[in-house]
Amino acid sequence: MGIKGLNAIISEHVPSAIRKSDIKSFFGRKVAIDASMSLYQFLIAVRQQDGGQLTNEAGETTSHLMGMFYRTLRMIDNGIKPCYVFDGKPPDLKSHELTKRSSRRVETEKKLAEATTELEKMKQERRLVKVSKEHNEEAQKLLGLMGIPYIIAPTEAEAQCAELAKKGKVYAAASEDMDTLCYRTPFLLRHLTFSETKKEPIHEIDTELVLRGLDLTIEQFVDLCIMLGCDYCESIRGVGPVTALKLIKTHGSIEKIVEFIESGESNNTKWKIPEDWPYKQARMLFLDPEVIDGNEINLKWSPPKEKELIEYLCDDKKFSEERVKSGISRLKKGLKSGIQGRLDGFFQVVPKTKEQLAAAAKRAQENKKLNKNKNKVTKGRR
């Protein structure tokens, strides 16, 4: 689900933190991609002309494999080295959100049964799309045969993507979920796995610029995201994005906001704090997520296993052999040329903390004063 209204807040208050670029701008970059989110996109977007999912002669869905194969090739063609990260076991705190999703599925199934037009049927069918265990396993098999590394995260894929970026294993995390910023990835790439026909630029969000622009610590930013609405718990009823930002900037933490509301000082009877609100547990899931230490992960891109890849996609899944062989040639060529990398890829760029930035600003101010005094002394001697 991500964070409700966060993109709008960043766009309004810190537009400089979002850079829109063509895919070619990321030549030589390694990127950790939220695989579960990508598969969901492929199942929705990769369709037949009649709007139905792609299937082979046996009736098996192949939209996810078609999307994974060709979108990965597009990245490789443009010199990007992708690594995919799959979701592990969801945190217990997410169970309420998963229950809500199940309830919505039941409601959607009812609407589908009542639909009278093809357009309405298609709309409801897309809402029922769900990434299954089989979809994940088939995608992992495909990536293994393509020579593309993948990781199964202990819990949330976005958290593991951010960990790889923080440890310098990749340049950025790629996901449509804005909650990836809560894990303090240096950079978040959105729309990376979109179809080329959409002509949608890639949005690169700089987390440190977001924090500085909003004048928030990472802890306050996470509290803001919980206030806006995340997958782990409810938010304060009656508080919208504008008010949530104002409350965090005024009071500094959810604890202080709760005190402010419960004391009656807010004079707002519409604000309702959820009972037994687990915001502290939600906060820790963002600030200290369960991940595999990025330093222990060695990402390796290997030549594709041509024979096995053709057997899997063409013999088993009934893909066009001519197109698959063409794709394999692109894959081999792209992985070879992508080895060149970028000059800045030889250096690990460590994002500065707020404290480091403040210290640097103080030093700059002191140097300015020192130079000013030197100029005064020089003028006096004249």
From Swiss-Prot:
It comes from the Eukaryota. Mg(2+) 2 binds at residues 177, 179, 231. Mg(2+) 1 binds at residues 34, 87, 156, 158. Its cofactor is Mg(2+). Residues 370-382 have a biased composition (Basic residues). Residues 120-251 are annotated as: I-domain. One of its GO terms (molecular function) is DNA binding. One of its GO terms (biological process) is DNA replication, removal of RNA primer. Binds 2 magnesium ions per subunit. They probably participate in the reaction catalyzed by the enzyme. May bind an additional third magnesium ion after substrate binding. Residues 358-382 are annotated as: Disordered. Residues 339-347 are annotated as: Interaction with PCNA. Belongs to the XPG/RAD2 endonuclease family. FEN1 subfamily. This is Flap endonuclease 1. The gene is RAD27.
